[in-house]
Amino acid sequence: MGSFLRSFRHNGGSTAPSVGAVPAKKEPQPPPMTPLEKRLLDMGPIREDGSDKFYGMENYGNTCYCNSILQCLYYSVPFREAVINYPTRTPIESLEAALAKSLRYPNPNAQLEAEAQAEKQKAANAQRPGMPPNPQQKPEDKDSPEYKKKMALQTLPLLETQNNASSYGMSESLFTSLKDIFESVVGSQSRIGIIRPQQFLEVLRRDHEMFRTAMHQDAHEFLNLLLNEVVANVEAEASKQPPIEKSLPAPETADSVDQSSSTGSKTPNTTRWVHELFEGLLTSETQCLTCEKVSQRDEVFLDLSVDLEQHSSVTSCLRKFSAEEMLCERNKFHCDNCGGLQEAEKRMKIKRLPRILALHLKRFKYTEDLQRLQKLFHRVVYPYHLRLFNTTDDAEDPDRLYELYAVVVHIGGGPYHGHYVAIIKTEDRGWLLFDDEMVEPVDKNYVKNFFGDKPGLACAYVLFYQETTLEAVLKEQEQENMDSNLAATDANDTILKQNGFPQSPLAHVHSASQIPSHEDNLRPNGLRRAPTAPQLSTHHEHGDPESAPFSPLSPLSPLSPLSPLSQTPPVPPVPERVTTVATPPKNDALAKKERAREEKERKAAEKEREKAEKLRRKEQEARMKENQRREEAELKAALEMSKASKAEEDRRLSHENGKEKQGGSLSRLKRGSKSLSHRLGKDKETRSVSSDLPPVPIPEHSTLSQTGPTSEQQQQQQQQQSPPNHDQPPNSPQLGKPTIREDEQVNHKDSKHERTGHGKWRSFSLRKKSFSILS
């Protein structure tokens, strides 16, 4: 087999030139296709509205600010149509005749000729004896924007605009120069190329002195100037025309008048198209804090400038734009009602929203420390779709939905230098990057790289939003989902390709009709891939040979002899669900069914989770209610027990207090006399020496009549029984001391007796009474 292939290649390449034959001239190879050309391969015929033209613009030295703004305005469909149709649309024949002179196609061999000339010059310099060899230059980076721009200038058609104001019936102005550019692009027969806006720049520098230098200019200032110039040129030209008669047109010319009006003919109503597209209305409300009078003033705007904050969004910046502002100190408000400067509150409200909203992010801020403008690299997120609300009561439309269609990006560290590029969303070719002469397709997510937080100096500077509807947004999202599914399918097909042939979904299934032929045996086997992991196979029981798996690597090798049909292994049964190959529409249908099934399962799972969560909350509430009832019952029982114990304590105290009240002072005297008589009896036992009579027993419960002598008689009796003490006078206070100590012992004994009868508090009261009597 190898010899067969070698002989085939040898025979195929054996056409050697004959001796003396003239070598053929090397044909120049065409330049490789750019990414934009690859994307435009499947486009149909050229459209008349110019929406399928993608032209770059040549940079004449720091004119990137002009190129980026002009690209954004061209791809605004209503603005482009209004410019082309005012005052009248130039016939396509006239445009083609003019473009035949202004459109220049470069020589496709210019690059090869330039390279050959450089090689000849290099060889000539090397042959000179006294010339030092040229240092080797580094090869150009073919992925750099500079190289791509140079190649675009060498390979793409160049479109030079000329002054055609006379054909419009107008004097040359900035508007007529803009119309020349738009009509040249629309009338060209090439979808790609490069415009040379030299005539437009000459008119701009002629009328405005600030743009005559080659210094870096501000793109937002140029946008504001261009829109105002267009308005001024259109209104000035309309004022020169005689007033239109009010008589009705003739029947035969009515259709032509309607057609001319619809295409933007020169009528008083058509001069307002710039205002209808870009003009909005703001209402400034100022309330004096002294007299509380509110004054209003309407202001028109063609673009809206908003202040920026770190880590914010366009929505928050617009909300801050409409926030209240305090006018005080040096910025007081002159109130006509008060007749002087007063403190006031000011607020800007949006009364009418434009169809095309040009949103200027104020990236350049003047700093007092540096005494100059400084660029703010704040992160400001801008959405693809923006909904704005009119904040006044008498607004015409309550809200409006916008979609982002263009972003002007400033690349640089400050306002005095840098570079501008434009990222624009086209009608049916997605997002494109316009960098002067270079035009390249980019992904939708590429727009998110210019919020201000990415590495580098590129930040979004001007955002262009155009009016849209909710239906259009939903349709666009559906189309994006379909494109992503197709891209995923293509990626899977690319991955499954083997040996240059697409892998079929049923490649692992071998039918009985697959009989190897002699031509199959002669096919080379050079790109066959061997598996690096063990192949998955099913388990076969009882060693059934008919159920053995058929491996993809099991077909006869080209180097092996041809085997008869009887030696081929049996084919396993094919499942019914894989008997047919699914076509792309069926794949899409299956994918839709699969997505619908997944969505249904997701919704069912979500309902189950909600049901379980509701049941869990219900059980938790029941437990909480049960705990609350139990706590209330325990608290109620504790209160009842507290009330019962309080009532018992009150009854016991009232019982004791009642007994004391019944006895009164006599009961206290009875207790005191009993204790005193008992104590005197003890003293008699200890101190009587001469008397042999036993002490008189005192009954434990004696009445007042049984107590006998009073306190004076008891003292006299004690003095008689006790021996006289000659060391101290009779009335000395020392006589009571031994009595008190002995009385303490007696009281200690009586306390035990009293505890058994009347409690511990009675013994304390007896001691107190005894001390009071003895003292």
UniProtKB/Swiss-Prot annotation:
Cross-referenced InterPro entries: Papain-like_cys_pep_sf (IPR038765), Peptidase_C19 (IPR050164), Peptidase_C19_UCH (IPR001394), USP_CS (IPR018200), USP_dom (IPR028889)
Q: Report which reactions are catalysed by this protein.
A: Thiol-dependent hydrolysis of ester, thioester, amide, peptide and isopeptide bonds formed by the C-terminal Gly of ubiquitin (a 76-residue protein attached to proteins as an intracellular targeting signal)
Cell membrane keyword on record: no
A Gene Ontology biological process in which this protein takes part is: carbon catabolite repression of transcription
Q: What are the start and end residues of every segment in region (Disordered)? A: 1-45, 113-146, 238-269, 496-775
Keywords attached to this entry: Coiled coil, Hydrolase, Protease, Thiol protease, Ubl conjugation pathway
- Where are the compositionally biased (Basic residues) regions? 668-679, 758-775
User: Known SUPFAM superfamilies for this protein?
Assistant: Cysteine proteinases (SSF54001)
The UniProt GO MF terms for this protein read: cysteine-type deubiquitinase activity
The active-site annotation reads C64, H419
What region holds the USP domain? 55-468
Q: Where is the composition biased (Polar residues)?
A: 256-269
Q: Where along the chain is composition biased (Low complexity)?
A: 546-566, 576-585, 705-725
Q: What is its EC number?
A: 3.4.19.12
Role description: Ubiquitin thioesterase component of the regulatory network controlling carbon source utilization through ubiquitination and deubiquitination involving creA, creB, creC, creD and acrB. Deubiquitinates the creA catabolic repressor and the quinate permease qutD. Also plays a role in response to carbon starvation and the control of extracellular proteases activity.
Q: Which family, according to UniProt?
A: Belongs to the peptidase C19 family.
Name of the protein described by the UniProt record: Probable ubiquitin carboxyl-terminal hydrolase creB
Q: Which gene encodes it?
A: creB
